[in-house]
């Protein structure tokens, strides 16, 4: 397997997540969920800025007008970077105060797919929602525990999804026009010693790059054969998500976490919570934006 080199950004997130590449700003965004922080890192200048919110901030992605779309606790909002104005768009599970949003992505039609979990990680307490132009969340999957990574194939016929504790990446038939999904098969089974699958993205060859929580790296899986192709080894245990970006879409930004590490482990793995940049030999696709 290839050996990768990385550079790190000293973010020191408690729970770094949701990397997103903004083409117009030529910068990476990510969040520190529990601390409500939004990071922006300009790739050319190397400058990082941080904005803080009085909520758990679980997701950042792009809106159709250049604004950001944020998931805060159980609500979705648009955020104007120039005015710093936050506008609430929709909400889920107001009857479940222990729940919060987690990972999310937009499909090729601009619909937002976003999951929930219980902050107590209660089995079966999470769901996956689809949010379209009418801003009404529609439940697509339930009985989830940690709704997590998602990706679509280039032909928009397959949707990949991770419910982390299952240690599986599931493939669903995807109907682009309607946004309907139907379970097809388990594409990848992840063995215990490799940790838990967390966030993921897909490259132009259709391979899945998956952050392994407790697995010290990002693993590249072939979802057709279920085989592990390669691994980006990182000097931290808890790797949480990854996204392609950069001018050639060949730079992988990887988020990590300090949570669930003891003081001794944090001394042993001092870069835990930092963000890593890795140049790959493949490319990703520009992320879809939320159309509403």
Residue ranges and their predicted role:
Residues 243-292:
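Blade-level signature of beta-propeller repeat domains, shared across WD40, Kelch, NHL, RCC1
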Residues 31, 41, 79-81, 129-131, ...:
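Hydrophobic/aromatic beta-strand positions that recur at structurally equivalent sites within the blades
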Residues 37-39, 75-77, 126-129, 168-170, ...:
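A short loop-to-beta-strand structural motif that recurs across blades of beta-propeller domains
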Residues 11-25, 54-69, 95-111, 140-158, ...:
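Beta-rich, blade/repeat-based domains predominating
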Residues 4-10, 46-52, 87-94, 136-142, ...:
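A short beta-strand motif characteristic of beta-propeller blades
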Residues 85-142:
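Hydrophobic alpha-helical segments and helix pairs
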